[in-house]
């Protein structure tokens, strides 16, 4: 049985800059901009994220222009930022070099 996502409380949202320092917190989403060496590196990263997202059945809004990837996470069914977004953001961060 898959757990239902829950919207983050105001207190939980306030802790996000400490737990996800590379992400920007918005009213109903979080976002991150990434720059890679070239298109192949950016696309390879997106492929790895796609596998993570598919495994969680939670998919980012994103775009790619050459070596840049823009990611926005929000739980549309709930109309805002949920625990699923935080979990996916943390998993995405784990794909990147420290």
Swiss-Prot record:
The answer to whether UniProt assigns keyword Repeat to this entry is no
Q: Name one GO biological process term.
A: tetrahydrobiopterin biosynthetic process
Supply the EC number(s): 4.2.1.96
| Disulfides per UniProt | none
| Alphabetical keyword list | Lyase
Source organism superkingdom: Bacteria
Q: According to the UniProt record, what class of enzyme is this?
A: lyase
Gene3D superfamilies for this protein: Transcriptional coactivator/pterin dehydratase (3.30.1360.20)
A Pfam family name for this chain?
Answer: Pterin_4a
Q: Name one GO molecular function term.
A: 4-alpha-hydroxytetrahydrobiopterin dehydratase activity
According to UniProt, the reaction catalysed is:
(4aS,6R)-4a-hydroxy-L-erythro-5,6,7,8-tetrahydrobiopterin = (6R)-L-erythro-6,7-dihydrobiopterin + H2O
Question: HAMAP family given for it?
Answer: Pterin_4_alpha
Q: Which NCBIfam families match?
A: PRK00823.1-2, PRK00823.1-3
Family of the protein in this entry: Belongs to the pterin-4-alpha-carbinolamine dehydratase family.
Q: What is this protein called?
A: Putative pterin-4-alpha-carbinolamine dehydratase
Source species of the chain:
Parasynechococcus marenigrum (strain WH8102)
The top of its lineage is:
Bacteria, Bacillati, Cyanobacteriota, Cyanophyceae, Synechococcales
């Amino acid at each position: 049985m898959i757990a239902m996502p829950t919207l983050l409380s105001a207190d939980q949202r306030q802790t996000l800059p400490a737990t996800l320092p590379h992400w920007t917190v918005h009213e109903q989403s979080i976002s991150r901009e990434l720059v890679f060496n070239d298109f192949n590196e950016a696309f390879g990263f997106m492929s790895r994220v796609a596998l993570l997202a598919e495994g969680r059945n939670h998919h980012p809004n994103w775009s790619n222009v050459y070596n840049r990837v823009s990611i926005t996470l929000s739980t549309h069914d709930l109309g805002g930022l949920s625990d699923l977004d935080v979990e996916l953001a943390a998993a995405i961060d784990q794909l990147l070099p420290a």
